[in-house]
């Protein structure tokens, strides 16, 4: 989405384009900026800008809205939130292992069972193009290959032919259309197909390393699947490519993706800075959780202790202990008005607050507080320090 230049943007407009209503020619003269498309490129700019202040490897996560000129429909938005996590300044494959673990941990915590983390490697795709003698058509080849699950083998063949890839070349690579089995079986199939490609064999070794490490560590709920047609972000990914699919039966596109980039900072003048990053499509994840009924029916209260309000003097006494509770890391609040006790207790019940504290005239005299456990109904008269220990 383009943004109009500040001030009198028409002052520098292409007069001819304006007169002829030629929007394509007019746009560059009135709009030099656009809404944020993703979080990866701004991150690369930040790293270059602050390269002398950062400690590498540098890790960060970022959650912000981004904008795309998409036609709005289920799972596609013009404005949506992305959550990115990146590590830059290391080419270690242990980072890939950790990012797969991160995906698995997050989706396990959300209760999403059966999430599939698909993985491929840019070097494997380069190897395919190399063995069929079409390295100069790598992008055309992989863009067509990436559509295999949508348009089928015949559709992919037709598109490759239309891009100038010969029928003989396609025939050489046809075995990848039938590549089936588990991760190890697919790897063995790749070895045969890419036996003459140095880049391809390097990609296979990287995939094997990641698979072996994760096999030894184990995943909680997700599964790792080798998808040799996966080609997202090919313009800047140089190694591992990742994409996360929603559980089977949920009609949704990818809910996450990422990969290894060896020179993304190069566009801003910092060469050879390797990194890897992944993204969570938050809005799509929300839709999946909603469809599967994984949102809780009631929101668990953050407040652990509610102090009833009996008047100004009592509230002042209560706030002294509330401050101590908060200092101890325990969420506490004072009911704002001296309403009827029944109303205040009902408020605590509806919000699921586990403890209620009564601080009336008697408690003030004794320098005590009455703590009520809302689940058991048990009441204890305690000093402020004893109360903190009891609810902490």
Residue map of PLM features:
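Polyanion/phosphate-binding surface patch
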Residues: 1-34
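Positively charged, Gly/Ser-enriched RNA/tRNA-binding surfaces
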Residues: 21-30, 38-52, 59-112, 160-392
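Short, surface-exposed recognition loops or helix-turn segments adjacent to catalytic cores
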Residues: 114-124, 141-142, 224-229
